[in-house]
From Swiss-Prot:
Known partners and oligomeric status: Associates with spliceosomes. Associates with U4/U5/U6 tri-snRNP and with U2 snRNP.
Protein name: Survival of motor neuron-related-splicing factor 30
Phosphoserine: modified positions: S201
Transmembrane regions listed in the UniProt entry: none
SUPFAM superfamilies xrefs: Tudor/PWWP/MBT (SSF63748)
Motif Nuclear localization signal: chain residues: 142-160
């Protein structure tokens, strides 16, 4: 999903650049100004959607680790760790420690869910429980914890689906507006006329290729000069 959103974001930015280029020559065009505003809004929406998921877990991890004292952990230790699905702290057991990367593989007690988390995010069980009690959170039963996690995941999924729906609607609206803008620009060209290059081949055998002067100083088209007398054959000995 992130890859698709990144592609859409690049597409929106490219469209915005084209609209801004068009506005440089027609800055009062209301349609272009509205299109620019809409594109800016959908770009911000896409950026927000891309950054929402990782920021939630990161914020929870940072706040949890900020009060984390140093502790020497070993395999088999009980600890309090953050579950990435809801950002809440639960009791877990250390299964493996990676000293090089500063991480630990843990399993949440009573659930069996395994995760790899930074060692700095772990707390001794008693300290973790006390921190939760001090914050006004009473220990919950296993059934209550499962119900809370399920409800959180459900709300998060609904919110995510709604944001995706809004983004898709914005994308469709922009597609229609962009097509209308292109059609209007195309229709302004006179029908039946084809722009020709000043260097295009003449349509008749008597036509000549020249460089137009655009009417400057009433000068005519530059005329073809016969340069045959300068042919190298005239310089060869007879």
């Amino acid at each position: 999903m992130s890859e698709d959103l990144a592609k859409q974001l690049a597409s929106y930015k490219a469209q915005l650049q084209q609209v801004e280029a068009a506005l440089s020559g027609n800055g009062e065009n209301e349609d272009l100004l509205k299109l620019k505003k809409d594109l800016q809004e959908v770009i911000e929406l896409t950026k927000d959607l891309l950054s929402t998921q990782p920021s939630e877990t990161l914020a929870s991890s940072d706040s949890f680790a900020s009060t984390q004292p140093t502790h020497s952990w070993k395999v088999g230790d009980k600890c309090m760790a953050i579950w990435s699905e809801d950002g809440q702290c639960y009791e877990a057991e250390i299964e493996e420690i990676d000293e090089e990367n500063g991480t630990a593989a843990i399993t949440f007690a009573g659930y069996g869910n395994a995760e790899v988390t930074p060692l700095l995010n772990l707390k001794p069980v008693e300290e973790g429980r006390k921190a939760k009690e001090d914050s006004g959170n009473k220990p919950m039963s296993k059934k209550e914890m499962i119900a809370q996690q399920r409800e959180y995941k459900k709300k998060k999924a609904l919110k995510k689906a709604q944001r995706i729906k809004e983004l898709e609607q914005e994308r469709e609206d922009q597609k229609v507006k962009w097509q209308q803008f292109n059609n209007r620009a195309y229709s302004k060209n006179k029908k039946g006329q084809v722009k020709r290059s000043i260097f295009a081949s003449p349509e008749s055998v008597t036509g000549k290729v020249g460089v137009g002067t655009c009417g400057i100083a009433d000068k005519p088209m530059t005329q073809y000069q016969d340069t045959s007398k300068y042919n190298v054959r005239h310089l060869m000995p007879q």
